[in-house]
Each structure stands twice: as C-alpha cells, then as structure tokens.
Amino acid sequence: MNYITFESTRPFDLVLLGRVAVDFNPVDYFQPLEECTTFKKYVGGSPANIAVGAARHGMKIGFFARVSDDQLGDFVTHFFQKEGIDTSRIRRCENGEKIGLTFTEILSRADSSILLYRNCIADLQLPPDDIDEEYIRNTKALLISGTSLAASPSREAALKAVMLAKRFGTKIIFDVDYRSYSWKNKDEISIYYSMVAREADIIMGSREEFDLMEALIEPGRDDLKSAAYWHAQNAKIVIIKHGKRGSTAYTCDGKQYTVRPFPVDALKSFGGGDGYGAGFLYGLYSGWEMYDCLEFGCAQASMMVAAHSCSEEMPRAEEIHAFIRASKEKYGETVCCDREEM
C-alpha cells in the first residue's frame, strides 16, 4: 500500500532543517579519548548525515541551516556541494557563533561515547526569516530534526517551516532526534516535540524519545498506544525503534511491520539511526513495499555502525543491496513482517 503520496512535479525530493556539525573520530581508537592523538574530520549532525545518505541514493536534497562564518563553515558547505546537496539556504552566523564539534571516544566495539562542544552554537541561530515559502513549496517533503526545537530562534524557524509545509501540501517528516545537551527541562521537550508531531505525516524515534514527547500528554504509553494516538492526529507512518531489538513501523491502516538489525561487527554505537532514516526514505520515495523500506533502512543502519564515519562512508544503493544479499546468504531472512490490526 502507498501510505504517502509525494507531489511528483516538485524539484526537490527532501529539504531538511536542523544541525550541521563537525565530527572528530579517533584513528587510534580502542583507548580513552585522552590518550588519542590522531583524528579524522567529518561532517556530522543527524540531519546532515541523513541528507548525505539520501543524496547518495540520487535524491535531490536541500537544507535550511546556520553554520559558523569560518573555515569549518567552509568545510561543511563545500562537502555538501560535492555531494550534490543544495546549499542556497545554508547561511553564515553573523555574531561569532560556532559550529558544533563532536569528539568520539571508542573504548571497544561495545563501548563508545561522544564529547560535545556546543556553547554559543551556530545551528540554533537559524532565524524564521531564513525560512522562505518558495523553498518549501518546491520540495516534496520537509524533514524537521527535533534538536532544532531546543531553543530560539531555531525553534520558531522550525515551526514556521511546518506551518508553510501544511499550507503548501508539503509532506512533513519528524525525526525526533533527542539530544539532552540542548534542552533546559523535560516539559519544553514534550511541548515542542508534540507540536511538530501533530502535523507530521511520518514520525521516527526511539521508545525513549516517544516517552519524552508524550510526557505531558499521557505518560507510560506502550508502542501500540503511541502509534494509535499519532495516527489519530495526522501521521500515516509511525516508526518506533528499540535499538538492538529492532524497530516497528505502524501504519495508518492498522498494520505493523517489524525488522531486526543485520549482524555486523560494530565499531561504534551511533550513526545507525541516520543511515536508517536515509535508507527508509529512499525506499518510500521509490514506491517500495513497507517491509522492503524497513529492511533497506535497517541494512544501511547496520553498515553505518560498522563504519568509522557517519557521513563520508554513507553507502550507495547498490552497496546496500549487495550487503543485504550477502547477509541473507550467511544468516537467513532478517525481516519479520506482521500485518495485525492494532
């Protein structure tokens, strides 16, 4: 079943709104960060990674963002341009705000973490004036990253973008993307997340992220209750992730589709969600069946946790198909598809 119909005549497949960052991942990993001396620099930030992943699948991508007016701002902008991502709405901060920096600590294949520098941060300086009607009118879908809602003026910019998308019939994708370092208290998380989720056609997040979003609405829901609630608002597809236990897509016709992760020798514990988002959306835009979209997204996620970077090593579609074939030959079928009424 085709749950989402995109306006085929629009030039952009997807415009994203959210943070662009710079990741520093150690080359000499499997030791504490304080002992690492050599790092590789990559473009980072969840929506930025999704943008790169989608662009490598041949999708036409645009981006609303603010970045620092310095060499690191040049770095991320030029990387996007090389990937074929439109940067006409990525603008420089004017008051010295800096792009976020992320240092990765990889102690072992089972133990990794990040150290963030986000004081006076550039991405949350995105003002409503940067959000123009033409750009949103010309895209099939708008993806809002939840981190953009953490503070003004980015918060108002994101809400303006959602309002314009509703006016022009642009589909809205909400990637909850909770990052604790950006928020002041849990009430505002629930308030602003739920404002966007009520308008979204697709909602993607972990069980923990849904709990935060629903804290002021009805705490303690299970997945079925969460999906039913957001379907009653506007959502056609609700994806709830459970990490290594897999994820389930709940669709507006009462069906649910569950997929388990592909076995890999993971290097780090993050980056998978960004690959998942890019892969799932590519399948959806391609008109695939829901279980094929999920399988493809899950495969891309598995490949990303085994990779050193989250952006530069985003795989192309043919690489993911080859990975799926090889994995099934070795481990058997991964997808478990249930079609049960909710």
Language-model segment annotations:
Residues E134-Y135, M195-V196, H231:
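Structural alpha-helical scaffold elements that stabilize or flank donor/cofactor-binding regions
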Residues K60, F64-I144, H321-M342:
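Conserved N-terminal subdomain of the carbohydrate kinase-like
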Residues A141, T147-K225, R245-G246:
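Conserved beta-alpha-beta core of the PfkB/ribokinase-like small-molecule kinase fold
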Residues N2-D86, D265, T334-M342:
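Glycine-rich phosphate/adenosyl-contacting loop at the front of the ribokinase-like
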Residues M1-L14, M163, A215-M342:
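Conserved phosphate-binding/catalytic region of the ribokinase-like
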Residues A55, Q81, M163-R167, A197, ...:
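Anion (oxyanion) recognition and catalysis
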